[in-house]
Amino acid sequence: MSEANDYSYNIASVEKTIRLIELLAETNGELSVLQIAKRLDTHASSAVRFLITLQNLGYVDKCEQIGKYRLTDRLLKIASNLIVSHPLTVRYLDVMHTLAYNLNATTHIMAFYGLSTITLHKDLQTQNISYNNAFFDPKRQHYCSAPGKLLLSTLPEEQLSEYLSGLKFIKYTSTTITSEKELRENLELIRHVGYSVHNEEWLSGCLTVSFPLRVYGEIRGAMSIMCSIERKDEILSPETLSEIKRMLAEPDV
């Protein structure tokens, strides 16, 4: 991810428009003009002008029955275009489907953004509903997730310490990591071996292995492979791991 520009001047109207879009996305459009104005720390008349502009551009709809606003599917169209042209899609989508077929496993491509993992693609080869739902459970924490731990392993110490300072460990299963010391040791292992493992730490019966996805040498996301824990020895065999790493290796530039 590119660094923010050092240029310190922001256009206030653009900044407020982006904040408005983010606000509507967070609340699913359940806000009135007065609520929006309060959240944006602006006058109601200003909030109305921003909303009308976004309506005219096709980004916002108003429910006349309740007088509240929501985002339209136009943003979904933009997101869809972004996913199609995303470098992780261009470079790794075919590999994801190939791995799912070859290993008879569920596979996911996730992008990393800050402390977030964003699912771009999935191939539910195993057709396991629990495996699918596990990736989208809002209660799930990075410390008990293979892609989450992989993300944590890439953070500089300052960001990792900030994450840990607000973390409350919960023991979901008998193998869940429950201390900072144990987590840091696991992250160091991930950096050493080049992949992360979910060993029933969140979902019993599930093995997940996540590998870093690089774009121009920078880790931008993860390829995750999910299957039954009974296949642990097979998936974590040196031969299988080596082949997966070979398939995910970034070509020489």
Regions picked out by a protein language model, each given a short descriptive name:
Residues 175-249:
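Extended hydrophobic
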Residues 39, 93-102, 193, 250:
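Amphipathic alpha-helical regulatory segments at dimerization interfaces
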Residues 60-62, 109-110, 213:
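A structural signal for short hydrophobic beta-strand segments in well-ordered beta-sheet cores
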Residues 10-14, 33, 68, 72, ...:
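Short, structured helix-loop boundary elements
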Residues 25, 152, 156, 245-253:
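Short amphipathic alpha-helical signal-transduction/dimerization elements
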Residues 70-166:
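Amphipathic alpha-helical effector-binding/dimerization core
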Residues 2-83:
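N-terminal helix-turn-helix
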